Amino acid sequence: MEAFRTHTGIGVPLRRSNVDTDQIIPAVYLKRVTRTGFEDGLFAAWRNDPSFVLNLPPFDRGSVLVAGPDFGTGSSREHAVWALMDYGFRVVISSRFADIFRGNAGKAGLLAAEVNQNDVELLWKLIEQNPGLEITVNLQDRNIIAGTVMVPFTIDDYTAWRLLEGLDDIGLTLRKQSEIEDYERRRPSWKPRTLPV
């Protein structure tokens, strides 16, 4: 997983609340056996509407999504995070995330930055008044800069550390590779073994 320190990209105002994982990517798009290629399913029902924000330049090139409260509710669908990332989003900003979505995002490398709702409203206003406005998100300092405005965000320390280090679940395991190999060498021969790679 790529480490996340700062990201600068076009802000996209998604003025919707209670966006669940089925709205992010409908189940019909989940039939792949790979972890990539889900961008076509992102907000598929809404993208049929020509006035939907992702159909409008410059928002169609955005990478910082500013969404309403309760983003990512519904089922535990990792594909929702993958679809956002495959489309090009690196950050989702909201005043409230579903716990499972927040966890899936952090494990995949997508920053779920939680701010208060007044700051979401302020960011929406700035983005809509200045289409193409670039937003910088700094994970180390835990702030968002849009024009002359700086907004703090919250994220738990463990998820922030994983993102800063670029550690997904496999990366975390590989940090202990020598200890795992040592354990395997010391196991009794009659117990099952993992095969060397």
Swiss-Prot record:
Native species? Mycobacterium sp. (strain KMS)
Q: Does the keyword Transferase apply?
A: no
Q: Which GO terms describe its biological process?
A: L-leucine biosynthetic process
Q: Return the broad EC class.
A: lyase
The EC code for this enzyme is 4.2.1.33
Database matches in NCBIfam families: leuD, PRK01641.1
Q: Which domain of life is it from?
A: Bacteria
The record's annotation in CDD domains points to: IPMI_Swivel (cd01577)
The family assignment reads: Belongs to the LeuD family. LeuD type 1 subfamily.
Per the record, the pathway is: Amino-acid biosynthesis; L-leucine biosynthesis; L-leucine from 3-methyl-2-oxobutanoate: step 2/4
- Give me the reactions it catalyses: (2R,3S)-3-isopropylmalate = (2S)-2-isopropylmalate
* Keywords on record: Amino-acid biosynthesis, Branched-chain amino acid biosynthesis, Leucine biosynthesis, Lyase
Q: Which SUPFAM superfamilies match?
A: LeuD/IlvD-like (SSF52016)
Q: Does the keyword NADP apply?
A: no
Q: What Gene Ontology terms describe where this protein resides (cellular component)?
A: 3-isopropylmalate dehydratase complex
Protein name, please? Answer: 3-isopropylmalate dehydratase small subunit
The free-text function statement in the UniProt record for this protein reads: Catalyzes the isomerization between 2-isopropylmalate and 3-isopropylmalate, via the formation of 2-isopropylmaleate.
Subunit architecture? Heterodimer of LeuC and LeuD.
Q: Which GO terms describe its molecular function?
A: 3-isopropylmalate dehydratase activity
